[in-house]
Amino acid sequence: MGQTGKKSEKGPVCWRKRVKSEYMALRQLKKFRRADEVKSMFNTNRQKIMERTEILNQEWKQRRIQPVHIMTTVSSLRGTRECSVTSDLDFPKQVIPLKTLTAVASVPIMYSWSPLQQNFMVEDETVLHNIPYMGDEVLDQDGTFIEELIKNYDGKVHGDRECGFINDEIFVELVNALAQYSDYEDDEDGDDNQDDEQDDTAKDQDDNMEDKETQPLRKFPSDKIFEAISSMFPDKGTSEELKEKYKELTEQQLPGALPPECTPNIDGPNAKSVQREQSLHSFHTLFCRPCFKYDCFLHPFHATPNTYKRKNNEAANDGKPCGPHCYQLLEGAREFAAALTAERIKTPPKRPSGRRRGRLPNNTSRPSTPTVNVSEAKDTDSDREAGTETGGESNDKEEEEKKDETSSSSEANSRCQTPIKMKPNIEPPENVEWSGAEASLFRVLIGTYYDNFCAIARLIGTKTCRQVYEFRVKESSIISPVIAEDVDTPPRKKKRKHRLWAAHCRKIQLKKDGSSNHVYNYQPCDHPRQPCDSSCPCVIAQNFCEKFCQCSSECQNRFPGCRCKAQCNTKQCPCYLAVRECDPDLCLTCGAADHWDSKNVSCKNCSIQRGSKKHLLLAPSDVAGWGIFINDTVQKNEFISEYCGEIISQDEADRRGKVYDKYMCSFLFNLNNDFVVDATRKGNKIRFANHSVNPNCYAKVMMVNGDHRIGIFAKRAIQTGEELFFDYRYSQADALKYVGIEREMEIP
C-alpha cells in the first residue's frame, strides 16, 4: 500500500497540482514585485521633485519680483464692463476691465494618426486590444455590435483570462521551480538504489571528469514537467515544443551567449573560420533586396541569394602578373586557374593556338590541369575580348622575345597593380597562418572573384596573391563548387527577345480579360535552374517575373522593360501599358535610370519610386471635415502623391472595416486581392482627400519595382489652391451615408 501511495504522488494529477500551485505563487510574487517596483519608482520620482522644488524656491528667494499693477477701469469708454475680485482675507479688492471675445468656429474633428512617407506592413491583430467607444446612439441602434465584434476576434480581448497568461519569463521560472520537485524525487530513488550502485563506484571515480562536463545535461528538467505544463496550458504547444522553447530561452540567458545561427564579428577578436554560407547568413536574412536596405518594414519575406552571376567584367582577370611575386609566375598556377574557370562555365578548356609564357610541353602537361588561354577563361560577354585573336601571333612573338628578361622594378608587393613580365617561379609554398577572419573573408570573396586571386589579395589586405592562391589550392576539397554558368546557348538578341515577350504578353492579356479584377501580390519565384512553366508561382498568379526572381534572365515570363526614347506617358510604352513604372535597372534609354537627384527626368513614368510629389496643404473642407489643397499648378495625368498607410490583409481589413463603418470614417484602400492599405492609424496627407462623383484626381494601383503602390494623379489641369477630390467608388447608398454634401461643379 505504501508503494502504491508513493506512485500516486508522482502521477500526472500530482504534477498538475504542482504546476497550478507554483504558477499561482509566481503570479502572486510577480504582482508583489511589480507593486514594489512601482512604489520604489514613485518614491524616487517624488524625491527628485522635492529636490527640484527646493532648488527653485531658493532661486525665487534671490530674485527681485516686480509687483503687479492693478489696472484701473476707464469709465469714459462705452460698453466697458468691470470685473471685481474680492477675498474674505485682508487682500485688497481687484477691479479689471472685462473684454468679451468673439465667437470662433471650432475645427473639424480629427483622430490621431502617425505620418508616413512609405507603406508599412503590419501583422494581423488576432486579439481585440480595446473595445471601441461608439456612443450611446450607436449602441441603441445596434446593441449586438460589440458582441459581433468580439466574435470576429474569436472572443479574444486584451486583458481577459488573466489567470491563463504565461510569458517566457514566467515559463522559465515555473520550470525551474518544478525542477526542484523532480530533483527531490530523483534523490529518493537514488537512496533506494544505493546498494545496487556500490559496485560501480570505482568506475564512476575514473569518469569523474566526464561527469562534471556532462552535469548540465543531466540537470535538464524532467519530461514530466513539460507534460504537466502542456496539459495546463494547451495553447502553448506540446511537451516537445515546450522543451525546445526552454532550451532556447535558457541558452539566451547564458552570459556571452550568441543568438542561434550567429557568427562572431569578422572584425572582432573572436572571429571564427566558417564557410561562406554561414558568414553571409545575417546578410541574406536581414537584407531586403527589393528595398536595398536592412530591417525592411515592407516585405515580410526575403528572397534567397541569386544564383545567377551578373554578366559584367568587374571580376575578370586580365592575365597579367601584378608584381614580381605574383602567383601567376608559379609553375602550374595558370593551369589551375584555367581549370577552375572551365569547370565553372561547363565547357572543356581549349588549348591555345600559339605558345605562351609558362606553358608546359605537350608531353608533360597533366590531363587534370590542361592549359587554357586566359582570354578564353574570362566572361563570355567581355568587351575586351574582341581583339584577342587578331593580334595573337604578334603577341606570342613578343612574349617569346621577352621570356628571359627580368624586371628592373624593385616592387616587392604582390598586390601592386602594375603588370610586370617575370620568369616562372618554382619556389616551395609558403607556410603562412590564416586567422579565422582572413579565412572567412576569403571564402566570401571566392564566390564573387573566382580565380582572380590578385583582386582577392587586395581586398583582404594582409595576404599576398601567392598566399591566397596556395590557400585556394589547399581548400579545393572544402569550398563548395560554384554553380556552373549556362553559356552553351548564346543570349537572344534584344529584338527577338522583345518579339517573344510581346507574344507572351498577348497570351497573358487574353487570360486577364476574363478576370481583370484579379490582381495578386507578387512574390519572387524560387526554382533555380528550372523554367517558369505552369507550376511557377508567378505564372499561376498571372504576374510577370521580376529582377528579384531566381529564374534565368532569358525567362520568357520576365518583364524586359521598355526601350522608349520619349516620356513613357502613352500606351506605346510597354511599361505604361502594363500599369507599371519604368524600372531603372531594365529601362535604360527612357531616362528612368538617370541620376536619382536629378529633378528634370525625361521619363514621366517613374514618379512614385522617386517620390516626386506635390506640395499639399491641410485645411478645413467645405464638403466634409478636413480637406487637402494643392499648392502647385498641376497638368493633366501628372503625379500628385502616393497614398501611403499600413498594409494589412483582407481579413484584417474586414475586421477593421466594421469599426470604421460605425464611425462613418474609413481610410481603407484595396491594393490587390491579398492586401489593403489602411491610412487610419498611419498615413500621409493625401488621406484627407474627400470623395466626389466629379473628381479632379484619380487613383491608380501600379507595379513599382515588384510592389503594388497607389498613386494619385490629376484627372484634369488643377490650379493652385484647389481642393483635391477623387472617387472612392462608393455605392449609391454608401455615398449618401458617408458624404452628405457634394461640391459645386467648377467650370474649368
UniProtKB/Swiss-Prot annotation:
- Which Gene Ontology terms of cellular component type are present? ESC/E(Z) complex; nucleus
| Limits of the SET domain | 614-729
Biased-composition ranges for Polar residues? 362-374
Query: Where does the protein end up?
Result: Nucleus
- Which SUPFAM superfamilies does the protein's record reference? SET domain
State the PROSITE patterns in the record: CXC (PS51633), SET (PS50280)
- Molecular function (Gene Ontology), one example: chromatin binding
- Tell me where the signal peptide lies: none
The answer to whether the entry has keyword Cell membrane is no
Catalytic activity from the UniProt record = L-lysyl(27)-[histone H3] + 3 S-adenosyl-L-methionine = N(6),N(6),N(6)-trimethyl-L-lysyl(27)-[histone H3] + 3 S-adenosyl-L-homocysteine + 3 H(+)
Q: Where is the composition biased (Basic residues)?
A: 347-359
Any Pfam family matching the protein: SET
Compositional bias segments (type: Acidic residues): 184-199
Region of interest (Disordered), residue spans? 184-220, 342-428
* Disulfide bond annotation, renumbered to this chain: none
Indicate the family of this protein.
Answer: Belongs to the class V-like SAM-binding methyltransferase superfamily. Histone-lysine methyltransferase family. EZ subfamily.
Name used for this protein in its record = Histone-lysine N-methyltransferase EZH2
